[in-house]
Amino acid sequence: MDLKQIEKLMIAMGRNKMKRIVIKREGLELELERDTVPSIQEPVFYDNRLFAGFSQERPIPTDQNLGNPIVKESIEKKESEAPAQGDFIVSPLVGTFYGSPSPEAPAFIKPGDTVSEDTVVCIVEAMKVMNEVKAGMSGRVEEILITNGDPVQFGSKLFRIVKA
């Protein structure tokens, strides 16, 4: 059996939707199989730039027809808890927020502090790696929106800044 015959067999398998064929003849054994799952899966990589415009905040479902008081109460509570408008420093990755370099050390920044673009404002731990987060803008820190040790998502608001 030569290569041309094997190619013809492969084409015939495709036309007839055959998954597997085994041929044994005159000391030759040939086994062809289609659409098999690979034994090793390729790793999947995600480009975080694709998610840059997405918000991590979820909309609160409303039930206007039923007048559900729990939903109305949660909407009113959510609106009152919403941080004031302004410029925000956001988390560049998913991890755990730390406001100081160690538990005993003072916080990197506090409300009222002035920051520049290169000022380290916090650390986000991801997979046991401590990643310094820089302000990326100049201004005065108005509010810290998260507490030490809290988990953060990509794009979570960390600090409210009034630009200088």
Curated annotation (Swiss-Prot):
CDD domains according to UniProt: biotinyl_domain (cd06850)
Gene Ontology MF term list: acetyl-CoA carboxylase activity
Stretches assigned to the Biotinyl-binding domain: 86-162
Pathway note: Lipid metabolism; fatty acid biosynthesis
Gene Ontology BP, a term: fatty acid biosynthetic process
Modified residues (N6-biotinyllysine): 128
Keywords: Biotin, Fatty acid biosynthesis, Fatty acid metabolism, Lipid biosynthesis, Lipid metabolism
GO CC annotation terms, alphabetical: acetyl-CoA carboxylase complex
Function: This protein is a component of the acetyl coenzyme A carboxylase complex; first, biotin carboxylase catalyzes the carboxylation of the carrier protein and then the transcarboxylase transfers the carboxyl group to form malonyl-CoA.
Oligomer and partners: Homodimer.
Listed name of the protein: Biotin carboxyl carrier protein of acetyl-CoA carboxylase
